[in-house]
């Protein structure tokens, strides 16, 4: 039996946890997971030594600085983790011939397009977070020849996320306000993890969009959460300019899984179905 050596960087994040959980039941994988305490991905020598020592077949880079508003005031940290660390990992993977997965975001787009974004659409990030992830994409393409860049959006799983925030607010408030002029596709880490694990068994390298099917506003998302959990709470729809935050968000974050569909690999469920399953298990 061939054993695949796989590294999950950022194993304690939502997606990293899901990938590790799914693979823990597979006897064809030898998995090592690292967090920022185990491996400083911003230190090239440390990354290089670690990857060369273990000679991984696949490296999944889930490590990121995802606090979108804090990125605006911590620009150096954002680029260090989201861009230059991605470069370190890509350089080391290329030395060993490892396949590399880089998780990217809908924030690389400006949200001004009418209709969903395809992988081939021009990127134009509005925020520091989006710009740092866009540069991470560039470095990944530049220094790795076996890369899968997967852009996703509105992710939820085992950790802090919009779903947990809404459920938490419902315990202390009778009425909340939620943005209703930004659209996107709520995406389960379970669906995304399965997509990644299918991709790494191929050599169909390139950029992919990976989100659940369908789209909604944050307001619609919140209402569906409360509906599925039978929670009685008033939800007020508001515009983005009424919700004060440091980073500009794209109004249209809908990604079309075009490349997955071309490769017959789009196994994402409708966002409502994935959400219902998630809520049944938390």
What are these regions (language model features)?
Residues 9, 34, 59-63, 100-105, ...:
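SDR active-site strand-loop-helix element
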Residues 217-219, 223, 239-282:
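Conserved C-terminal active-site "lid" loop/helix of NAD(P)H-dependent oxidoreductases
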Residues 30-47:
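Adenosine-cofactor binding site in Rossmann-like domains, unifying the SAM/SAH pocket
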Residues 80, 84-88, 95, 108-150:
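Catalytic helix-loop patch of NAD(P)-dependent Rossmann-fold dehydrogenases
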Residues 5-24:
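N-terminal Rossmann NAD(P)H-binding glycine-rich loop of SDR-like oxidoreductase domains
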Residues 138-186, 190-191, 197:
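NAD(P)-dependent short-chain dehydrogenase/reductase
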Residues 195, 202-247, 251:
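Mid/C-terminal beta-alpha module of Rossmann-like enzyme folds, strongest
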Residues 44-81:
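NAD(P)H-binding glycine-rich loop region in Rossmannoid oxidoreductase-like domains
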């Amino acid at each position: 039996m061939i054993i695949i050596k796989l590294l999950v960087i950022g194993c304690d994040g939502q997606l990293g946890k899901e990938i590790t959980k799914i693979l823990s039941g597979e006897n064809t994988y030898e998995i090592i997971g690292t967090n920022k305490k185990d491996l400083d991905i911003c230190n090239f020598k440390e990354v290089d030594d670690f990857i060369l020592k273990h000679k991984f077949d696949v490296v999944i880079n889930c490590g990121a600085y995802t606090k979108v508003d804090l990125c605006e005031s911590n620009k150096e940290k954002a680029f260090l983790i989201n861009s230059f660390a991605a470069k370190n990992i890509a350089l080391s993977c290329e030395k060993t011939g490892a396949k590399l997965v880089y998780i990217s975001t809908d924030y690389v787009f400006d949200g001004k397009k009418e209709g969903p974004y395809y992988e081939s659409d021009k990127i134009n990030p509005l925020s520091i977070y989006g710009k740092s992830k866009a540069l991470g994409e560039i470095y990944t393409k530049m220094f790795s020849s076996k890369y899968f860049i997967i852009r996703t959006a509105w992710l939820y799983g085992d950790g802090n996320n919009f779903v947990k925030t809404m459920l938490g607010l419902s315990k202390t408030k009778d009425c909340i306000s939620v943005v209703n002029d930004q659209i996107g596709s709520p995406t389960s880490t379970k669906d995304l993890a399965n997509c990644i694990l299918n991709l790494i068994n191929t050599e169909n390298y390139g950029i992919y969009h990976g989100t659940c099917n369908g789209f909604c506003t944050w307001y619609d998302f919140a209402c569906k959460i409360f509906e599925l959990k039978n929670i009685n709470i008033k939800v007020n729809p508001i515009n983005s300019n009424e919700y004060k935050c440091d980073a500009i968000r794209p109004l249209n974050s809908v990604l079309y899984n075009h490349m997955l569909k071309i490769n017959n690999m789009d196994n994402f469920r409708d966002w409502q179905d994935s959400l219902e399953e998630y809520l049944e298990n938390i």
